[in-house]
Amino acid sequence: MSLKGSKTEQNLKDAFAGESQANRRYLYFAAKADVEGQNDIATVFRSTAEGETGHAHGHLEYLEKECGDPATGEPIGDSVSNLKAAIAGETHEYTDMYPGMAKTARDEGHDEIADWFETLAKAERSHATVSYTHLTLPTNSGV
């Protein structure tokens, strides 16, 4: 039975997203603990974040084989494919996701958050440009 299109594929995508978010949260918590001088707690959060990264990578390895990038659906695996998937993701973020979020925030009167989303859209465009630059380097001439 194919993984693509299955409930298991969706479960892997959901688990990847959850583990990835946990990693980022725990690193944020570790930074907060550092500011508070709670070095032992910061260490616990960093260690846990590292474990969550391993879990997320495991999910991604299963998705890589048949399903591709869980965010874009683009094939992933080798560096050229990974750059193309990154460009697709970053392009979506700066052309659709963040502009739409900024509009909603502004419509709801959250101007500071709208400004934040607009700033992030610019950053994502820069990320896409950097990835595209590396994709078109002569060392990737087989693209």
Where would I find each of the regions flagged by the language model?
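Amphipathic alpha-helical coiled-coil segments
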Residues: 54-61, 126-132
